Every structure is written in C-alpha cells, then in structure tokens.
Amino acid sequence: AASDVYKRQNVKITVGNRTITATMEDNAAARDFLSRLPLEITLNDYNNMTEKIFYPDPALTTEGVTRGCAPTPGDITIYAPWGNVAIFCKSWSHSNALIKIGRIDGNGIEVLSIAGDIPVKIERR
C-alpha cells in the first residue's frame, strides 16, 4: 500500500561535524515535515534547555492528527497553538497541545542538549 512508504521514515540531522538520526511518525504532520526536507535551520533554545524549537513557514498541517503527548528526551513534536516544532531535550508534563511527529534515535538527543542556538541540517536518510 502507498501508506507503507511512510511507516518508518528516517531522517538525518547534522549538527556541526556530528550526525544523529530520527524516526518519523506515520501521520499527516510528519509527512508534511518530510516533504520540506532538506532543511537548514537554527534550533533556538527554549525554556532553559528543555526544548529546541523552530517555526516552519508555512506551519505544518495538523489536520486530523492525534493530539496529546507527554514528551521525553528525543521526542520531536509540534506545539499546535504556535505552530513551532519542539525537540525535547528534557521530559515535560503531558500536554494536549503537543503533536508527536518523530523521535531522535538512541541517545542522539545529547548532541542537541547544549545551551544556546544550534544550526542544523535535516534531510532524508
């Protein structure tokens, strides 16, 4: 089936000379994100290194996508009210406003768990 192509889409995130990978969810928001790749963006530090965020332009679709997520380190989410993508470096309480679109593999989140803004390149694997 056509949808099988999206079951486990992987992306590569390059941070300086280091590369980490992430596995995307099978939902409309994740598919919209994948359609934008490759992306060269700056992840901004938010909430004292709890998350790294950026604002896709235009915002990713959230139509028909299940909301609600209790993020743990490595989760890639959309904060629906603002439309920003938030990659969590720390665990956070459950929020109905969060939509999970993927997860950084293994302990790759350590590469992003640093202070300040981080330029990254995101592309399909």
What are these language model-derived features?
Residues 1-6:
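Short, small-residue-biased leader/transition segments that mark boundaries at the very start
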Residues 9-53:
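N-terminal secretory signal peptides
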Residues 42-125:
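Glycine-rich active-site loops that engage anionic ligands at enzyme catalytic sites
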